[in-house]
A protein has these predicted regions:
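Bacterial N-terminal signal peptides that target proteins for export
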Residues: 1-9
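Bacterial N-terminal signal peptides
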Residues: 10-18
């Protein structure tokens, strides 16, 4: 890659990182509810009308205690609309007792150990030459990239999910709201 191309890529990445980082707010609103940095992931998520499906799934999978714990965690939180994109009946099937192992695997695939703000992810993307690999609590990986100023995650099956609200700071980590459910292998 010649110097001009390197500079163009660097400028595009820096613009994207700046736009993403600027989306961070003090006590942002998610799903019509203020998110407080003094509350944990579960305490905040239960108040978001956009995350009722996620909260129900977390409860069914027995992950409430974990996500109320000290962490820190980075959670890529799918909205109700993200779950609605799944084939009809998928959520109901996953919530059945015999499928809770699969549900837990999908949910923990949305969690990365540690607190990673958009700025932290942007640094990893820059250091990775335009891509960053994030290892999830489930054990799989997500690929993070910038696309026109937006942070996009690619899952193990090649599906993509865009961060729509970044840097929702919690007492035990950070939430990034995403528009599509990510799928592990």
């Amino acid at each position: 890659m010649n110097n001009r191309n390197v500079l163009a890529v660097a400028a595009a990445l820096m613009f994207g990182f700046s736009a993403l980082h600027a989306s961070a707010q003090k006590d942002p609103t998610v799903g019509g509810a203020a998110m407080y940095p003094t509350k944990n992931i579960v305490e905040n998520a239960v108040n978001s009308k956009d995350h009722t499906t996620l909260v129900a799934a977390v409860k069914a999978a027995g992950l409430v205690e974990t996500l109320e714990g000290p962490g820190p965690f980075t959670v890529f939180a799918p909205t109700n609309e993200a779950f609605d994109k799944l084939p009809a009946g998928t959520v109901d099937t996953l919530l059945k007792a015999e499928n809770l192992g699969t549900l837990k695997k999908i949910l923990t695939y949305h969690v990365v150990a540690g607190k990673m703000t958009s700025k932290d992810i942007a640094k990893k993307i820059k250091m990775g030459g335009g891509k960053a690999t994030l290892t999830t609590v489930e054990g799989g990986t997500l690929t993070a990239m910038m696309d026109g100023g937006k942070l996009v995650l690619t899952d193990a099956k090649g599906g993509t999910s865009t961060v729509t609200i970044a840097n929702v700071i919690q007492s035990n980590g950070v939430i990034h709201v995403v528009d599509t459910v990510l799928m592990p292998n």
